[in-house]
């Protein structure tokens, strides 16, 4: 390949479903490599399978790419020099090249019926050999072809595969050898007149001047067919890079259902696009200095497809299935099930926490607002990017957030107006053992103090511990339940300064009364 050519990569999804994990990684790798090389990233829609392609899916794919921050330089909505960028609008182009291949005897019409082909496949299976089309109609005379056309016999068009050894020098997988005799004459135009995947992709990539084809390793087997077509059409062959297989926590290939999770589900679960982009980039690629958390904009500068590994990449977002289970989720369109199945110690959560901590507070607040919209337990005036209360709370709690969807429950803790103890277990922390003593002592010391900062409150609780002889769980749990009604939540020294002394005293008075603990001696 001419090394001086502008790098041009592409992502070419079929609009027949969501943009899933594997597709998102492919799009991202192509986008990042083009950007890092000062090149162009092209989006093309492969909708030649008219039975499966839908307008809704097309819109969702565009929405998903935009959320992920993968912006195309040419493609739908913006056009470009080499359009149209939707395959169903390029049928005349494919027809022109098909006529060329037929004229040069590099392709031929195949009049075999589906039933005949199925019978040949079954015969090969019975013999225990791979099925390879036998080229029955490869050498028909022009007269024989014309006769069948007059009879309006349906046909497909097959490429006449030359017998040779092909060596694919893949950027990621290395040198891979293919024997074309095991491929046989393959279909390039289906009986409905639409081009096959392998044919359309070659014509499009060639005419759109694609220099690098970056995709999942599952497409490696398509590569020899595509190279043969490039040669037959006399086009320069692009460089190929087949990214590693993605596996789950159990080391097995990511299941179709888990792998088909829409990336928009992660948006709806509170993950920022910066985080998800960072995580997806690490599925098969490493930076030259080994860093994993990469600031916004850096991936576009440093990504190099030559640093991708061919070893399987672990998608650790979901927990490992238990023995006997195939899935940790039975419905991957159910956000609740997805959330419950997620691995709390995943790299995605680690990156997400880092992102939320480091991001400008204004960006965090802007991204958070949609998660507050329907919460009745948070005052309307707080659901505002300019709210001082919201800013203070998020500044204090963001170090604890793995995703923004966790924030509303924490925020709501600050605005409880009718505090009640949430469970029998929580009540037990207040009433059992030295719980009442701890609650009374905390109330008394707080009433006679004027704490303002988290350090003030830490000192105050230490003093309660000294007086009562309690520490750890037996000290903090009674205080937590007395002030929040719950046995889990934010760290108390963070919560208390934001609530303030008076609100804390009111809360303790209410929960103590509910638990039957007298505060006066």
From Swiss-Prot:
Motif 'HIGH' region positions after renumbering to this chain = 13-23
* Chemical reaction(s) catalysed: tRNA(Glu) + L-glutamate + ATP = L-glutamyl-tRNA(Glu) + AMP + diphosphate
CDD domains given for it?
Answer: GluRS_core
TM stretches of this protein: none
> Per its UniProt entry, which superkingdom is the organism in?
Bacteria
**What are the GO MF terms of this UniProt record?**
ATP binding; glutamate-tRNA ligase activity; tRNA binding; zinc ion binding
Supply the name of the protein: Glutamate--tRNA ligase
What organism, scientifically named, is this protein from?
A: Leptospira borgpetersenii serovar Hardjo-bovis (strain JB197)
Q: Which gene encodes it?
A: gltX
